[in-house]
Amino acid sequence: MLFRSLEAEKGNLHLIDTVLDKIDIVFDGADQIDKGKNLIKGGGGALLRENILINAAKKVVIMADESKFVTNFNRDVPVEVHPLARNTVTKNISKIGGRPKIRTLDRGYPFITENGNIILDCNFGVIKKPKQLREKIKNISGVLEVGIFTRKPDIIYKARSAGKFDVIK
């Protein structure tokens, strides 16, 4: 990232600072939102950066259509993993009840994040205790980030049909 930032500056392009302290507000989406306003994010593969930005933000605003709202999470949890740790992380996620599979591109190659890591999409069935599961996964050596975000958004815009929406605070 530092090299890209320096190259961009040569072309008079200004990128986001690579050393973040505080951000006023983050607007983002979510793959799922549970009844406790926890989020599953990372379907696009940028979960490490998304989590850094959300945790640096003074205010977090999430926008999602009504299909993304669930009582309990029931979709795969993205887990960003250092490539060297893929096999051990896969075994350890299986030990805590997950069914991990490496995210691949259409042509069968592994999906590589913008940070050079891989994503394991992990099925845990219905997740009733997301914070505890996040902590278990995060404690596995080689796991860089988990797609369960437990920082509660300040505002959620829930899009409904016909252009209507609800504001959840």
Regions found by a protein language model. Give the residues of each.
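Binding-site signature for planar aromatic cofactors or substrates
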Residues: L6
